[in-house]
């Protein structure tokens, strides 16, 4: 009797492959070790009557800037060491040194640089000038940019006249590197839905919003998409964008709509929060993250994930209360978070990381 060993060998190889093949994680949280529980060390770090509606935090050195539109101004500056209130700045308007509402930016080297894609303006404020009580609100320079039909949701000033933008370029690319003369040095990384014909250029841009952070050298950046498990780690080398690592476990779920010149990208019942807020230091990228569905919870989380700049998971923290935004100090010693108390008042609390 002739016996064939080929089917048996094939089955054996299949079983061995099934045992050794790396299983794709269902959640970002599975990439990290057991979270470290943290308890708040300073529940009300800044004066409680100094905040209205917090929409973001950034920290660098001794400067803690809170996005908080109040009395016609966009931001409030606190001392990151003591919590002392210093001043409000970023007046809303169209005059010299004034900006549009909802302008986001990056804080580094004592400068807070914000942008508005509708007006194509980039505006810079000097933190030392603000601390010295300048009458002109710390405004130091402004310039316009022109990248054709490209649209930006976030912008970082890298220094030496270079800007890094995240958004949508040529209905295809997610990132752009350009200079103050509007010369485009590079574009990189295809957006997740570039081939999805249910999206046009406007709804595709709306479905690729997210958060962007950089390290102090301006050479490393990280960008995460809203309502997703997608985060990219990038480097800028000799005028080129290099994708260091891309962790794309679950794309956003959007319903694109357009009618009468009005465009929207709405979340679905299956959409989840994913990456909520990013912040960074020279060593790490911190990410506020939630696996919960949008319809089941608010846009907050008690889970903070920590990556190194190569995109490797390092550790995770579990806060004792849900946070809306986060910012780490440059020594990786403290984490500032925005919280809402039982009376729906905003406050900034601090967690010790060491």
Predicted regions and their residues:
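Beta-propeller blade signature
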Residues: 175-180, 300-311, 350-353
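Loop/turn-rich, solvent-exposed surfaces of beta-rich toroidal or solenoidal domains
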Residues: 268-306
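Beta-strand-rich domains and repeat architectures in extracellular enzymes and scaffolds
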Residues: 44-74, 276-277, 284-291
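Surface-exposed loop and turn segments in beta-propeller and other repeat-based domains
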Residues: 35-47, 87-98, 137-148, 185-207, ...
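Asp-box/WD-like beta-propeller blade repeats and closely related beta-sheet repeat scaffolds
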Residues: 127-159, 166
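C-terminal motif of bacterial Sec signal peptides marking the signal peptidase cleavage site
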Residues: 16-18
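Bacterial signal peptide processing site
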Residues: 20-23
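Structural signature of eukaryotic scaffold interfaces centered on beta-propeller domains
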Residues: 55-58, 103-107, 153-159, 204-217, ...
